[in-house]
């Protein structure tokens, strides 16, 4: 399995499985001198961890992070930063019945076909449990970006199933389990998910992430465009099925006279492009939307096959989210941070001496 690393200059390599002893990662390329503590990382992990509401999996993982290397006397040393999160609430017995069968919608079938072996306990390496490591690494990137460039990265749930969530304020996001930017709609969201659960079903969601304060110039055309790398990172999240930058697919119905963001001496007049032009940051807010599919594990009888190809009916058991998107916001933020820090370092490496007089906004 060769796809466990993301980044060019600032990289994360993750390891571990859902029901193994631990998950972890190695963050390489972080500049020396960044003040970094366990608390800096833990506060981000606490936003993502399971068992925090009735609408997410009831697996109780404290997600306590350990920094194994790369930090001395509270500062990064420039060497690889080792991160470890021990698994403490595995129930492998819940998965014994699927050792030789393939759950519909999961990676069971493809992992078996590709590797000829799979860890069936909780999905093994394909489990979203691994995303805790991304959030931990993203916390480092978030802090560096904020201190070095004043970049702020914030996300929210903008749609749950067929319910659009109007944006009200960023302050509302931290006050509810949905990461919804609108508190008046919470009763509707609660009732909707309760109904989905009572029907023994699941539903998808859309997460919106905004990076504010990104300077002009980040991105490496033509193959490592900033928007291309953002899309690559987001599609690497479990259950992600689509990514939009700026107006995204709505651009199909727009005219050029609308979509093209006009410039004025004071800056851009609009931001349909989502803060990226030609694969390079424009200085505007970078805006992305990520679509997450419904949870594949639902307590209904489904048709499938076993590893010998025999037809069967199966019903998934275990502890699962009725909507994986409920906990996805910190993960989406983390992936945005990882990409932006990598591109900040790449831009600095080649273009640090470039200076132009045109207004930058």
From Swiss-Prot:
Residue sites binding NADP(+) per the record: 48, 54
Record text on cofactor binding: Reduced FMN (FMNH(2)).
Keywords: Amino-acid biosynthesis, Aromatic amino acid biosynthesis, FAD, Flavoprotein, FMN, Lyase, NADP
PROSITE patterns, per database record: CHORISMATE_SYNTHASE_1, CHORISMATE_SYNTHASE_2, CHORISMATE_SYNTHASE_3
Coiled-coil region: none
Enzyme class: lyase
Residues holding FMN: 125-127, 238-239, 278, 293-297, 319
Catalytic activity line of the entry: 5-O-(1-carboxyvinyl)-3-phosphoshikimate = chorismate + phosphate
InterPro entries on file: Chorismate_synth (IPR000453), Chorismate_synth_AroC_sf (IPR035904), Chorismate_synthase_CS (IPR020541)
Pathway(s) the chain acts in: Metabolic intermediate biosynthesis; chorismate biosynthesis; chorismate from D-erythrose 4-phosphate and phosphoenolpyruvate: step 7/7
Requisite cofactors: FMNH2
GO process terms (BP): amino acid biosynthetic process; aromatic amino acid family biosynthetic process; chorismate biosynthetic process
Protein family according to the UniProt entry: Belongs to the chorismate synthase family.
Protein name: Chorismate synthase
Organism of derivation: Methylobacillus flagellatus (strain ATCC 51484 / DSM 6875 / VKM B-1610 / KT)
């Amino acid at each position: 399995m060769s796809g466990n690393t993301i980044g060019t200059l600032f990289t994360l390599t993750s390891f571990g499985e859902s029901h193994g002893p631990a998950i972890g990662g190695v963050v390489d390329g972080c500049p020396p001198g960044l003040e970094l503590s366990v608390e800096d990382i833990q506060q981000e992990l606490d936003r993502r961890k399971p068992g925090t509401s009735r609408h997410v999996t009831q697996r109780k993982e404290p997600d306590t992070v350990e920094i194994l290397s790369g930090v001395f006397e509270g500062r990064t040393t420039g060497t690889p930063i080792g991160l470890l999160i021990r698994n403490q609430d595995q129930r492998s017995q819940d998965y014994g019945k699927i050792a030789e069968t393939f759950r519909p919608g999961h990676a069971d079938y493809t992992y078996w076909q590709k590797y000829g072996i799979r860890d069936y306990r909780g999905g093994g390496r394909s489990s979203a449990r691994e995303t805790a490591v991304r959030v931990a690494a993203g916390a480092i990137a978030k802090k560096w970006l904020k201190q070095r460039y004043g970049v702020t990265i914030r996300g929210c749930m903008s749609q749950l199933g067929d319910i659009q969530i109007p944006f009200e304020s960023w302050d509302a996001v931290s006050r509810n389990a949905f990461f919804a930017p609108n508190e008046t709609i919470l009763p509707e969201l609660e009732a909707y998910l309760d109904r989905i659960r009572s029907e023994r079903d699941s539903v998808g969601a859309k997460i919106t992430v905004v990076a504010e304060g990104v300077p002009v110039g980040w991105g490496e055309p033509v193959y490592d465009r900033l928007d291309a790398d953002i899309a690559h990172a987001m599609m690497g999240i479990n259950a992600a099925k689509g990514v939009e930058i700026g107006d995204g697919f709505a651009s199909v119905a727009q005219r050029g006279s609308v979509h093209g963001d006009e410039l004025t001496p004071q800056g851009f007049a609009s931001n349909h492009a989502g803060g990226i032009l030609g694969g390079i940051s424009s200085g505007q807010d970078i805006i992305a939307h990520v679509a997450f599919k419904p949870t594949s594990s639902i307590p209904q009888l489904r048709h499938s096959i076993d590893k010998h190809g025999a037809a069967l009916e199966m019903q998934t058991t275990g502890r699962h989210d009725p909507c994986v998107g409920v906990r996805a916001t910190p993960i989406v933020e983390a992936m945005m941070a990882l990409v932006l820090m990598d591109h900040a370092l790449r831009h600095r490496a080649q273009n640090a001496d470039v200076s132009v007089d045109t207004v930058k906004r």
